[in-house]
Amino acid sequence: VMQYWMAQRVACDTLAAYIVSVNWSRTFISDALKACAEQNGVEQVISYVYANELVTKPGSDECTGLIQGPGQRERILTGPDKVKMCEAIASKSAYDTSVYVGDSTTDIPCLLWADMGILIGSGDQVRDMLHQAGMDSVLHTIDSWKQLDVMQQRASIVCASDWYAVCDLLQLQ
């Protein structure tokens, strides 16, 4: 569902989609997305994957155990590193609204940074960390988020159970 929705918007030039990851390599993510798109008969719509890459020995597929950042950039290791990457992407974007979808604790800074931060899935660890920081009030169900004014929405994280809910939420925009 999300792939079809995104493909339509990318084709109409109303959406650019990126992935920023601390845990997975760019090659792994790109290959998984390509296989998924082929399996579902849709175009791969992610504009670019920003993730660390495993360093291999020259002329070999053998990994050295080191990682390097995307392109010539610093490695992405923490939530603040993800925010720096998102800020760099947004500064070059033709779009004026940033939406960030995440599910882990390293996503918290980006969920709070984005114009629209969407916590997908149960997000138990994210919820626990926000609770420990006394920030429970930033989390909203989709229904309660809809009742907020624009400034309050931008200072909030909206919780979506799955990609269907994310798709429905984004169609409101």
Give residue spans per PLM region:
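C-terminal cap/substrate-recognition subdomain and adjoining C-terminal extension
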Residues: 1-173
